[in-house]
Curated annotation (Swiss-Prot):
May bind 1 zinc ion per subunit. ATP binds at residues 86, 104-108, 499. Its EC number is 7.4.2.8. Zn(2+) binds at residues 848, 850, 859-860. CDD domains: DEXDc_SecA, SF2_C_secA. Its cofactor is Zn(2+). This is Protein translocase subunit SecA.
Length: 867
């Protein structure tokens, strides 16, 4: 973040907080009045606010009384009163900004203020969480508050049916994950009926852990895909070839996440490919006919040299499951595209699944920008404030803590090797454990968490491990990390959304320990014992120094490190944070500067000796800033390309919705355009009368109608002939409509037209996405010809899109013209377009029939080649 931006950001932040404090005073002034209301009178306020909105008041006009009502309802039904700083957080959310609040400051409670106020409009509010557990937990927890005010609330998780989802989306406030919301959007736009759609629009979203969702996951598109049958054995053969390569056969670029074959490597691969009869004796790897082999080789190299088991993915139940690099969570159901997942399956000797074709996709960047109003909450957003502002138009406001943070952040310790580092971590944990100080150790991978776990076991130190393998116990493990003497090892996921309370979480403990007790009196007695025990344990933990957070490696992003530190020192509790690093860590090895390396060599590191130096801390921060800046540039570049696709996606989805929501009996506009296009492609620049026979033949193939050549020859120009043809085609479709509507179902033709239009549009859109993805991957080479790849992509994507729309009209009319019912005796029998499209054969070097001016092989012919 630039000095200027920091300075500006700081001054604006102060002004916003100052202006909101004045509104807090107005809310506080209503507290006594709200406390005097009965439960019924408090609930009646919701209807009163709705009436005032109808009478012309705005949500801003109602903010003060609405926030006062929510605070009082929370005090009564949740036994929690919003602090003044939480009211400020609620105002930040309502104003479409990001509220940065430290861990333990009650973000879940803050969201209720803005959610309630915005629900009064009746357009729906989405509260977005990072996992199903939090969506369900927050709904159940906050439902007492919402229900007491007559506001409906629901949650959406991945196990709900479409009917249940539709009902949930109709609630005033909906809690769900970012994945569920975006996938429901894609699924809705693949439905064949509006009644089957589950969502009801994009009014207002509050995104919890906004940095994780809008930044960390921004590069990953959400894809709904279907399998494409192919010969999967090729992946097995290529995997065997790649495992035979030696270090001199390839170069690994860890920064750019790429692997390249050397000259020796190319020769070796060609020799091995010939031995498997995958290429001919005389051909080379880069011959036109063998280009697909380079794709398989590239993916196999990436699978072996860039992707590590238990770090980037794990093998579970015979499947490769991706691990989110930022959260450490398993991403079940997600697969890498472009054959990479198949390459990993071959590497791990698993059954290879079919490669998938994209049916629909969207990025979180473009999904969340569809909301009329967007806001977010997180404990760490300041480092990414510039990106949130530039891409999402979200300003970040740092909310003051309710109590001053007392956590001590100690300088990093750097060791020569990973082994020395882990030994130092072990020694430090022992010291903390001796004084009963609770310890949370953060690791960047499952591999490291299990390595450290084995080390602790060897020294008889009891501990809990939290990583993608054991994510089911996440909430309980992390909630008990504050118990005196407890040692918890966690990957980056670190239980975001679950508070670490010193002494332990009484509610969580009670949920587990009271399960088997049936007697009400005994349950109450046991519950009181738990409360007392937690109180005593909190005192012990505080005397020991509070929660000690240990980082075993710096992450690429400072924000992830800050999130780990932020687990300690909640609500004014004491705490400590310290990072232990080694020269073998990824960040030091890949991104550390030459200056830092030479400095460390000069200083010299003896066995088990650590370096403490403020300059090293600054150098590390500089390396992290470099990586953050690079990642931001990547995300910004991807967004520019995705915006092109997103604009086309909007057009397609709007067309789809228009088709689903309207009666479509008159096809004149569609077929008249198609007929004009066909006429132009036949006549081109020649004389109309020279092509009468070709015209009659072409339209007979397309519609099965016979055009009198003598009649056609009478016309003076092609426009007159076109009017005549359109009239004949109109008669043809009128007869077809009468026939189908006479099959006991009066509006069958309209249904047929809609279904064919939708199926054609979906089919072409799938092919279009595939073509655009190939174009995007290759367009970077245009830079070598002094052309801007983005402008080239925009230009070509537009031409291909126009071609696709024209092709859609042509294919729709053709399919409708040849449409038949499977069985006329079945009322509304299965609709069955004839499988073969009898359109005229086009040579690959001819101009494309869609009139784009491009050769067929570079336009619609590309679809055939790709598939």
């Amino acid at each position: 973040m630039s000095f200027f931006f920091k300075r500006t950001f700081g001054s604006i932040n102060k002004k916003i907080i100052k202006s909101f404090r004045k509104i807090v005073e107005q809310i506080n002034a209503l507290e006594t009045k709200m406390q005097s209301l009965s439960d019924e009178e408090l609930a009646d306020k919701t209807e009163e606010f709705k009436r005032e909105l109808k009478n012309g008041k705005t949500l801003n006009d109602l903010l003060v009384p609405a926030f006062a009502v929510v605070r009082e309802a929370s005090r009564r039904f949740l036994n929690m009163r919003h602090f003044d700083v939480q009211l400020i957080g609620g105002m930040v959310l309502h104003n479409g900004m990001v509220s940065e609040m430290k861990t333990g400051e009650g973000k879940t409670l803050v969201a209720t203020l803005a959610a309630y106020l915005n629900s009064l409009e009746g357009k729906g509010v989405h509260v977005v969480t990072v996992n199903d557990y939090l969506a369900k937990r927050d709904t159940e927890w906050m439902s007492k508050l919402y229900n007491s005010l007559g506001v409906s609330v629901a949650f959406i998780t991945n196990d709900l049916t479409d009917e249940e989802r539709k009902e949930a989306y109709s609630a005033d406030i909906v809690y769900s994950t970012n994945n569920e919301l975006a996938f429901d959007y894609l699924r809705d736009n693949m439905k064949f009926s509006r009644e089957d759609m589950v969502q009801r629009g994009f009014n207002y979203a509050i995104v919890d852990e906004v940095d994780s969702i809008l930044i960390d996951e921004a590069r990953t598109p959400l894809i709904i895909s279907g399998p494409v049958e192919e010969n999967n054995q090729i992946y097995k053969h290529i995997d065997k070839i790649v495992t035979k390569l030696v270090d001199s056969d390839y170069e690994v670029d860890e920064k750019g996440r790429a692997v390249f074959l050397t000259e020796d490597g190319i020769s070796q691969v060609e020799e091995l490919l010939r031995s498997y009869n995958l290429i001919s004796e005389k051909s080379s790897l880069y011959d036109a006919g063998n280009m697909i082999m380079t794709h398989y080789i590239d993916q196999a190299l990436r699978a072996h040299k860039l992707f590590t088991a238990d770090k980037d993915y794990i093998v579970k139940d015979g499947k490769v499951v991706i691990i989110d690099e930022f959260t450490g969570r398993m991403m079940e159901g997600r697969r890498y595209s472009d054959g990479l997942h198949q390459a990993l399956e071959a590497k791990e000797n698993l059954e290879i699944q079919y490669e998938n074709q994209t049916l629909a996709s969207v990025t979180f960047q473009n999904y969340f920008r569809m909301y009329n109003k967007l806001s977010g909450m997180t404990g760490t957003a300041a480092t990414e404030a510039e990106e949130l502002r530039d891409i999402y138009r979200l300003n970040v406001v740092k909310i003051p803590t309710n109590v001053t943070v007392k956590r001590i952040d100690v300088d990093d310790e750097i060791y020569g090797t990973e082994k020395e580092k882990f030994n130092a971590v072990l020694k430090f944990i022992k010291e903390c454990h001796k004084r009963l100080q609770p310890v949370l150790v953060g690791t960047v991978s499952i591999e490291n968490s299990e390595k450290l776990s084995a080390l602790l076991r060897n020294h008889f130190l009891r501990h809990s491990v939290l990583n993608a393998r054991y994510h089911e116990q996440e909430a309980y493990i992390i909630a008990q990390a504050g118990v005196p003497g407890n040692i918890t090892i966690a990957t980056n996921m670190a239980g975001r959304g679950t508070d670490i309370q010193l002494g332990g979480n009484a509610e969580m403990i009670a949920k587990v320990e009271l399960k088997k007790i049936k007697n009400a009196d005994e349950r109450e007695k046991k519950y009181q014992e738990i409360i007392e025990r937690v109180k005593r344990d909190k005192e012990i933990a505080m005397k020991a120094g509070g929660l000690c957070v240990i980082g075993t490696e710096r992450h690429e992003s400072r924000r992830i490190d800050d999130q780990l530190r932020g687990r300690s020192g909640r609500q004014g509790d004491p705490g400590l944070s310290k990072f232990f690093l080694s020269l073998e860590d990824d960040l030091m090895r890949i991104f550390g500067s030459d200056r830092m390396r030479s400095f460390l060599k000069r200083v010299g590191l003896k066995n088990n000796e650590a370096i403490h130096h403020p300059w090293i801390n600054k150098a590390l921060e500089k390396a992290q800033k470099k990586v953050e800046a690079r990642n931001y540039d990547v995300r910004k570049s991807l967004l520019k390309f995705d915006d092109v696709i997103n604009n086309q996606r909007k057009v397609i989805f709007e067309q789809r919705n228009h088709i689903l929501g309207n009666e479509i009996n008159d096809l004149f506009e569609v077929y008249s355009e198609v007929n004009k296009s066909v006429m132009e492609s036949i006549v081109q620049g020649g004389y109309y009368e020279d092509y009468v026979e070709d015209i009659a033949k072409e339209f007979h193939i397309r519609y099965g109608i016979t055009l009198d050549k003598k009649d056609l020859a009478k016309f003076l120009n092609k426009q007159e002939a076109l009017d005549y043809i359109n009239g004949k085609v109109k008669e043809f479709f009128t007869e077809k409509e009468k026939y189908f509507n006479g099959q006991q179902t009066t509006d069958l033709w309209n249904t047929i037209v809609k279904q064919v239009m939708i199926m054609t549009l979906d089919h072409l859109w799938r092919e279009h996405l595939s073509i655009l993805e190939s174009l995007r991957q290759s367009i970077g080479l245009r830079a070598m010809g002094q052309k801007d790849p983005l402008n080239e992509f925009k230009r070509e994507a537009f031409l291909i899109f126009e071609c696709m729309l024209e092709r859609g009209k042509e294919l729709t009319i053709h399919r409708l013209a040849h449409f038949k019912l499977v069985d006329n005796q079945e009322v509304g029998g299965r609709l069955h377009p004839t499988r073969k499209d009898n359109l005229p054969k086009v040579s690959r070097n001819d101009k494309c029939p869609c009139n784009s001016g491009k050769k067929y092989k570079h336009c619609h012919g590309a679809v055939t080649v790709m598939n």
